[in-house]
């Protein structure tokens, strides 16, 4: 099997299959490309995903009646998101040149500060300033957001417990001090639980930012390989009902307003992303984690394992498997049930079928009778270690909450005397309970 990208020897002067004049430098999808044609090919994938009139320059009545769109681009300063920034600014540059300084939309870059979390090799703020200079005269604004801003209202924090039949309850905690997000995440027993909770945090912060910045469109730089990775990871984590939102463009309702989520690079393999980055000299802007990556399987997160799987497929010439996975996932629509759905009060996802009923059917809840003193001693040790698993009789002064299967799995793995503390979502009075005026976004926040 051939590699997804094959670089050619330019001394052989093999003509480009597209323009027929320039020398081809690589082969992708069995086609020979010169540098300019390959860059144009990748940019064309983004244009295909964003053909809506609202992203085009408007004149006359259309300009008066339709304000300029604001588009939020999530930027981690990884290779994929950097390529997406380059692709989007190339579109804006074309509009700027063809329409005498006009742009069809305003681009807002959002970076969620991971400097300490991932031990990044440099400040993202410095990179963002360099990017703004690189793409002048295109007007780009950027925001750097702290992870700690996820917990704005301490009164929303409550302790969550699960009893033996998988019913979840929330319990008020003493607010004699403020809890930081770092303290909450420190309760995670493993990297997979931490990864799952961080995904919930990122999604929420991105939607909050889109709301406050009046951005109606949100762009993710996920490649086809990344989307295939997410499909497998979501399946393993028990979040299969969310796959349809990960695979294709869709709308999300947040605070009674719809936001369009678009994956402009969903038709591009990660190997092609790397080639584009190399040819466009974007590698110098990439920010990487300095944390050593574990090679021991048990120390890897679910996403680490699925990423390694697709990396091996790329290395062995089976990169097209990602396309098959995405096409299969693309056939999955939103779950359809006649019963009324509810909202998970941990992650906010829609619950179409109560996971408790299914878990009770497949789980043996009653243990065999304890016969020896040793067995009784082990049972007591287990009860002390499993502080989040409580018996139904101890549910007084606790409020039942709705929780999805994925969050049930994540929370049940957390064992700590303080329990699992998390900001509970209350859909009925969400806007009243959250403190929007304390949510501060700046484009000059210190990244460290």
Curated annotation (Swiss-Prot):
Record GO cellular component, one term: cytosol
UniProt KW keywords: Cytoplasm, tRNA processing
Pathway noted in the entry: tRNA modification; 5-methoxycarbonylmethyl-2-thiouridine-tRNA biosynthesis
Stretches of the chain forming a coiled coil according to its record: none
Cited InterPro entries: CTU2 (IPR019407), Rossmann-like_a/b/a_fold (IPR014729)
Chief location: cytoplasm
TM spans (from-to): none
Localization per Swiss-Prot or TrEMBL: Cytoplasm
Pfam families listed in its UniProt record: CTU2
GO biological process, one term: pseudohyphal growth
Any one Gene Ontology molecular-function term assigned to this protein's record: nucleotidyltransferase activity
Purpose: Plays a central role in 2-thiolation of mcm(5)S(2)U at tRNA wobble positions of tRNA(Lys), tRNA(Glu) and tRNA(Gln). May act by forming a heterodimer with NCS6 that ligates sulfur from thiocarboxylated URM1 onto the uridine of tRNAs at wobble position. Prior mcm(5) tRNA modification by the elongator complex is required for 2-thiolation. May also be involved in protein urmylation.
UniProt similarity note: Belongs to the CTU2/NCS2 family.
Listed HAMAP family: CTU2
PANTHER family named in the record: CYTOPLASMIC TRNA 2-THIOLATION PROTEIN 2
Protein name per its UniProtKB record: Cytoplasmic tRNA 2-thiolation protein 2
Lineage: Eukaryota, Fungi, Dikarya, Ascomycota, Saccharomycotina
């Amino acid at each position: 099997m051939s590699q997804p990208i094959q670089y050619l020897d330019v001394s052989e002067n093999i003509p480009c299959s597209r323009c027929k004049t320039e020398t081809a430098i690589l082969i992708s999808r069995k086609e020979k490309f010169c540098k300019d044609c390959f860059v144009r090919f990748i940019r064309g994938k983004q244009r295909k995903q964003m053909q809506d009139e609202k992203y085009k320059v408007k004149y006359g009545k259309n300009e008066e009646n339709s304000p300029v769109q604001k588009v939020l681009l999530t930027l981690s300063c990884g290779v994929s998101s950097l390529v997406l920034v380059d692709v989007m600014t190339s579109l804006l540059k074309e509009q700027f040149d063809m329409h005498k300084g006009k742009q069809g939309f305003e681009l807002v870059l959002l970076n969620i500060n991971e400097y300490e979390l991932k031990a990044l090799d440099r400040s993202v703020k410095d990179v963002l300033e360099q990017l703004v200079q690189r793409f002048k005269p295109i007007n780009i604004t950027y925001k750097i957001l702290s992870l700690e801003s996820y917990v704005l209202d301490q009164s929303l924090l409550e302790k969550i417990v699960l009893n033996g039949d998988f019913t979840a309850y929330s319990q008020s905690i003493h607010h004699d001090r403020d809890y930081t997000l770092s303290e909450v995440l420190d309760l995670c027993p493993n990297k997979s639980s931490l990864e799952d909770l961080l995904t919930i945090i990122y999604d929420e912060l991105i939607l909050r930012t889109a709301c406050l910045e009046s951005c109606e469109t949100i762009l993710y730089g996920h490649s086809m390989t990344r989307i295939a990775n997410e499909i497998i990871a979501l399946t393993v984590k028990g979040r299969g009902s969310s796959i349809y939102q990960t695979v294709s463009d869709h709308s999300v309702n947040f605070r009674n307003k719809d936001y369009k989520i678009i994956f402009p690079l969903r038709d591009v393999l990660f190997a092609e992303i790397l080639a584009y980055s190399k040819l466009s000299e974007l590698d110098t802007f990439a920010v990487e984690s300095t944390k050593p990556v574990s090679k021991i399987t048990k120390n890897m997160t679910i996403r680490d394992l699925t990423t390694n799987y697709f990396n091996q497929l790329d290395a062995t010439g089976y990169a097209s498997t990602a396309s098959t996975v995405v096409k299969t996932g693309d056939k999955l629509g939103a779950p359809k049930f006649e019963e009324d759905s509810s909202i998970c009060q941990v992650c906010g996802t829609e619950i179409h079928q109560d996971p408790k009923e299914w878990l009770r059917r497949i789980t043996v809840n009653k243990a065999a009778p304890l016969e020896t003193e040793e067995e009784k001693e082990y049972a007591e040790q287990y009860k002390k270690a499993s502080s989040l698993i409580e018996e139904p009789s101890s549910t007084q002064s606790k409020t039942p909450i709705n929780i999805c299967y994925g969050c049930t799995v994540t929370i049940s793995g957390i064992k700590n005397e303080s329990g699992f503390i998390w900001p509970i979502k209350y859909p009925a009075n969400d806007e009243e309970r959250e403190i929007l005026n304390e949510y501060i976004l700046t484009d000059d926040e210190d990244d460290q």
